[in-house]
Every structure is written in structure tokens, then in C-alpha cells.
């Protein structure tokens, strides 16, 4: 009969290995967290090198945390200790006492008594470890008496369910939407880019990208010739180009397509011209099924003319916001297909990091929160500033990424604080360059939807800039603690969005998936400014 372990025991010299081998083993994952020596991990079983029970229960009390993008996101940085089982040892001992009683009943010489004793056994709880006393008593005893499935079948079934759960967990939306391959449509989807972003009204159109080659999106026909307007299933408008004088909307509503009696072309005020064009837009239908897509990657603080856009003018939104119709962030983390491969981006050894804090800023404005916080932080720790304006110095010839890689920390300070507004300052300048980002933007919870919580430092975590400076100096003196901010690289890699090719292809992908569902944006400004 299998030996039951009741009272707590200590290792009996060199014989504890034999006792451990004879004891019923728990399933993988039922126990974890090897932290310290000399404590029993379970009543009746002495486990050398396991954590003490106070630490065990303290870690067990930590709530599980998850991330999301568009509601979900990357999994948080693994802390190095797996979750502990939530039951204390006293409760486990109380669960063993009925087991002893049931086994004594099974020794009855009467078959009927034995059957009643078998029926009185507690039912194994769903999800209980297969090697637990409940499973051993219920599952194995039933097999020996010809009741139930063979033990090998049970083990194989449990292994199959475990593999299925792990695959589902790994594949379920832990990251913002990635450019997965789309089914090839019956006919290519045409997407017309009305203005070249930041290129000016008279700039030559760029060659369209190959969506299949670059982003694994097939069935796209990217258009730049406005003569193909009637063939496009979607037309992409960049918001910044809407504010450059009277907008030349597509026909039949374009201002230049009407006489001066209909629209006064002398009016150069953007809001009045846009309102006039939108009034014309309601007079004639668009091509059937065509979607107008509003595209913007600036924050509401730097997006003029939002409130001048009439209701129902656009059908979709494309932006960094996770609740956009077409969500295209500045960057994201994706699971590494081969964990043994070197991490993406730059990760120079600590011996090559000669500086402490770096900051690259292109637009210096004393009114911005990031500049005010810099002045406070620079009083307690040295910050090397690169870029135009303020105390900035030119970026060295080796380039921005290699310059930042020489520093331990990078100030990923956004020019304004809005929902989901997390730009290349985090993804490219810090994470890809191999520096720990110190972020100032939306709150920490917003960042944790897209980035592991142990991959960055938020200014809101500290009551003052001096406290943050003290913590940065502490990490500088403790390399082992500093390296923890790079543990996420073992599981994830950084993707930097390719502007403007990737948004173009992502609109094509969205059209393929949307079907014929109609939609229009009733109040664009109220949605984007919240």
C-alpha cells in the first residue's frame, strides 16, 4: 500500500531521497517557488531548498496580472517565481484525515461494505492534480477494481488537455492585433491614398508597398491615381493634410469641381472651407460600399480642425488608439518564435553603457509637462539631452539608436498625455535601442496594456523627481536589479510600425475582414478628444 505522509517530517540524513521517491508526487505546476533552504513545502514532506511558508503565503496572495491590447496585451514580465498553490498546509492535513478513514473502510471483508466505502470517497475536484491524494484514491482504486479507465489513458487524457490549454493560452490575444495572413479575397481590395502624408498637395505619390511581401497581407491593390477613385473600396485621408488650406475632396464634392457661386474659393479659412465641402458631400452618394478612412497619429493636443469635421463624413478611424476601427500603434511586442535566438534590437553589455540618462527631444516647449519635469529631474541626476532646442546637442554620427544604447535609461516623455498615445519614443528610442525607458504619458495602467510592467519605469511611481533620481542611482549601483528590466526580451521582440506603408496595408486587411457592414462616425472630435 502506498505510504501516506501525515505529520511534518524532517530529512533523515541521506535517506530523504528514498522517502521522497516513495512518496506520491504532485503534478507539474502544483508546487513551485523554490526560494530558500530548510523548510518543508508540505506537511509530511521535507523539501530541501523550498521557500518558507510565510514567503509562500505572501507570494500566493499576489493577484495575477494580465495585459491587453484593444482590451488585451502582452503578458507581464515573469517575476522568476511561479504562482504558489493557495492552500495552506493545515488545510491539506485536514483533507488527508477523511482519506485515512475511507481506506480503513475499504479493508472490510464484505464486498457490499467495500462498495459503500468506495462510493463514500470524495469526488475528485475538477482540475485537481493527478498525483494528489484525492486522485490517487479515487482514480487508481477504481482502476484496480475494474471501475473507470486505465491509469495510462487518464494520464494521456490529462496530458492532451494540458497541451491544449497551453496552446490556447499562448495564442489567445495577448498582444495588440498583429498582421496575420488574411484569406485571399475573390478580387483585390483597392485602397486609394488621397494625399501623401506630410508630402504636400503637389508632391509626387510614392510607389505602393507590397503588402504580401512586407506584412503577409494578400489581395491588396494600393492606388495613388485619383482617377481610380470609383474603383476603390476605401479612401485614406491623412488629418494633417486636411488642415493645409481648402481641402480638395474627391469628386463630385471637391471644392475645385464647383463654381464660385457654390463655394467661395477665396475663403482660405480651413474650418469654413471644410464646412462648405461637407455640405456638398451630403448632396450626392459615394460609390456603393466605399469607405472613407480618417487617419491620424498625432495626439488631440496637436490635431487642429477636429471639431470642424461634420458628422457622418468618415466611415472608419485609423490611429494609435486601441479602439480605432483600424488599430495601428507606433509599435508593439510580439512573441519570439525561437526563444533561443538573440533578442531583437540593441542590448549592449553594461560595460559599454557609459552614461546614465539620455533624452532626445525634437520640439522644445517650456509649457509642456515633459520639459518641466526634466528641469526638476536634472537637479538631482545628470541628463544628456540631444536634439533641437533647449540644452540639446546634435546627435552623434553613430546615430540615435547607438547613442541611446550607451545609456542605462532613456526619458520616453510624450509631448502630451492622452489615452494610448505611446509613440516611437518608447518603442524605438528606448526598447529597441536597449535602454530602460522612464515614461511620462498616460497612466501606468495604460502602458501595461501593451508593455510588461517590469519593462519600464513610470514617473507616477514616485512622489517627486528627486525620488525618481534616487531610484535611478540605486539601479546604477546594483547591476543585478537593473538587468531585471530586460527579462521581457527572453519572450518578446519589438516591432516598429513602418509609416506609411503599414497603415495603408492594414486598411486593406480591415476591408477584407469587415464585409458589407455599414458604419459612419457620428462625432469624430468627441471620440478622439476624450
From Swiss-Prot:
Biological-process GO terms, alphabetical: carbohydrate metabolic process; fucosylation; glycosphingolipid biosynthetic process; inflammatory response; L-fucose catabolic process; Lewis x epitope biosynthetic process; lymphocyte migration into lymph node; oligosaccharide biosynthetic process
Basic and acidic residues bias (residue ranges): 88-106
Membrane topology of the entry: Single-pass type II membrane protein
Enzyme class (EC, first level): transferase
UniProt key word Glycosyltransferase: yes
UniProt key word Transmembrane helix: yes
Membrane-traversing stretches: 148-172
InterPro entries named in the record: Glyco_tran_10_C, Glyco_tran_10_N, Glyco_trans_10, GT10-like_C_sf
Catalytic activity: an alpha-Neu5Ac-(2->3)-beta-D-Gal-(1->4)-beta-D-GlcNAc6S derivative + GDP-beta-L-fucose = an alpha-Neu5Ac-(2->3)-beta-D-Gal-(1->4)-[alpha-L-Fuc-(1->3)]-beta-D-GlcNAc6S derivative + GDP + H(+)
GO CC annotation terms, alphabetical: cell periphery; cell surface; Golgi apparatus; Golgi cisterna membrane; Golgi membrane; membrane; trans-Golgi network
Keywords per UniProt: Glycoprotein, Glycosyltransferase, Golgi apparatus, Inflammatory response, Membrane, Signal-anchor, Transferase, Transmembrane, Transmembrane helix
Region annotation Disordered: where it falls in the sequence: 1-48, 66-112
SUPFAM superfamilies per the UniProt record, alphabetical: UDP-Glycosyltransferase/glycogen phosphorylase (SSF53756)
Stretches assigned to the Lumenal side: 173-530
Superkingdom classification of source: Eukaryota
Enzyme Commission number(s) from the entry: 2.4.1.152
Molecular functions per Gene Ontology: 4-galactosyl-N-acetylglucosaminide 3-alpha-L-fucosyltransferase activity; alpha-(1->3)-fucosyltransferase activity; fucosyltransferase activity
Sugar-modified residues: 216, 315
Tissue: Expressed in cord blood immature promyelocytes and in peripheral blood myeloid and lymphoid cell populations.
Protein's cellular compartments: Golgi apparatus, Golgi stack membrane
Ranges per topology, Cytoplasmic: 1-147
Similarity annotation: Belongs to the glycosyltransferase 10 family.
Name of the featured protein: Alpha-(1,3)-fucosyltransferase 4
Amino acid at each position: 500500500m502506498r505510504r501516506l505522509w501525515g505529520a511534518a517530517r524532517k530529512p533523515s540524513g541521506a535517506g530523504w531521497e528514498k522517502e521522497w521517491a516513495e512518496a506520491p508526487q504532485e503534478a507539474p505546476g502544483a508546487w513551485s517557488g523554490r526560494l530558500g533552504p530548510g523548510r518543508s513545502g508540505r506537511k509530511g514532506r521535507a523539501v530541501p531548498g523550498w521557500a518558507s511558508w510565510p514567503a509562500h503565503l505572501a507570494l500566493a496572495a499576489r493577484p495575477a496580472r494580465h495585459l491587453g491590447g484593444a482590451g488585451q496585451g502582452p503578458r507581464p514580465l515573469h517575476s522568476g517565481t511561479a504562482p504558489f498553490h493557495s492552500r495552506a498546509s493545515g488545510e491539506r492535513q485536514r483533507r488527508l484525515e477523511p482519506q485515512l478513514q475511507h481506506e480503513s473502510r475499504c479493508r472490510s471483508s464484505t464486498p457490499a461494505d467495500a462498495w459503500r466505502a468506495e462510493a463514500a470517497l470524495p469526488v475528485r475536484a475538477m482540475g485537481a492534480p493527478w498525483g494528489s491524494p484525492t486522485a490517487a484514491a479515487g482514480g487508481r482504486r477504481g482502476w484496480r477494481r475494474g471501475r473507470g479507465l486505465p491509469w495510462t489513458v487518464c494520464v494521456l487524457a490529462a496530458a492532451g488537455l494540458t497541451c491544449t490549454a497551453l496552446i490556447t493560452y499562448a495564442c489567445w490575444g495577448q498582444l495588440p492585433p498583429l498582421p496575420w495572413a488574411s484569406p485571399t479575397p475573390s478580387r483585390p481590395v483597392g485602397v486609394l491614398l488621397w494625399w501623401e502624408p506630410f508630402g504636400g498637395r503637389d508632391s509626387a505619390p510614392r510607389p505602393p508597398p507590397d503588402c504580401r511581401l512586407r506584412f503577409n497581407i494578400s489581395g491588396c491593390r494600393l492606388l495613388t491615381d485619383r482617377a481610380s477613385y470609383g474603383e476603390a473600396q476605401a479612401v485614406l485621408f491623412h488629418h494633417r493634410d486636411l488642415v493645409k488650406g481648402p481641402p480638395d475632396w474627391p469628386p463630385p464634392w471637391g471644392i475645385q469641381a464647383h463654381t464660385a457661386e457654390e463655394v467661395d474659393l477665396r475663403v482660405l479659412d480651413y474650418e469654413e472651407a471644410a464646412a462648405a465641402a461637407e455640405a456638398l458631400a451630403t448632396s450626392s452618394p459615394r460609390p456603393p460600399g466605399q469607405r472613407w478612412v480618417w487617419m491620424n497619429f498625432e495626439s488631440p493636443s496637436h490635431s487642429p480642425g477636429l471639431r470642424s469635421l461634420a458628422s457622418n463624413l468618415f466611415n472608419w478611424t485609423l490611429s494609435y488608439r486601441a479602439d480605432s476601427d483600424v488599430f495601428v500603434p507606433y509599435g508593439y511586442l510580439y512573441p519570439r518564435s525561437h526563444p533561443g535566438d538573440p533578442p531583437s534590437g540593441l542590448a549592449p553589455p553594461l560595460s559599454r553603457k557609459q552614461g546614465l540618462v539620455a533624452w532626445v527631444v525634437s520640439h522644445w516647449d517650456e509649457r509642456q509637462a515633459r520639459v518641466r519635469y526634466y528641469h526638476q529631474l536634472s537637479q538631482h541626476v545628470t541628463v544628456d539631452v540631444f536634439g533641437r532646442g533647449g540644452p540639446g546637442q546634435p546627435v552623434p554620427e553613430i546615430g540615435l539608436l547607438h547613442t541611446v544604447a550607451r545609456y542605462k535609461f532613456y526619458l520616453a516623455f510624450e509631448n502630451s498625455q492622452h489615452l494610448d498615445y505611446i509613440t516611437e519614443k518608447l518603442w524605438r528610442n528606448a526598447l529597441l535601442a536597449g535602454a530602460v525607458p522612464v515614461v511620462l504619458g498616460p497612466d501606468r495602467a495604460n502602458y501595461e496594456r501593451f508593455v510588461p510592467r517590469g519593462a519600464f519605469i513610470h514617473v507616477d511611481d514616485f512622489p517627486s523627481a528627486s525620488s525618481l533620481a534616487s531610484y535611478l542611482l540605486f539601479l546604477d549601483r546594483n547591476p543585478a536589479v537593473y538587468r531585471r528590466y530586460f527579462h521581457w526580451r527572453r519572450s518578446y521582440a519589438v516591432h516598429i510600425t513602418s509609416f506609411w506603408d503599414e497603415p495603408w496595408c492594414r486598411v486593406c486587411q480591415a476591408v477584407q475582414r469587415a464585409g458589407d457592414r455599414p458604419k459612419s462616425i457620428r462625432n469624430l472630435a468627441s471620440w478622439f478628444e476624450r
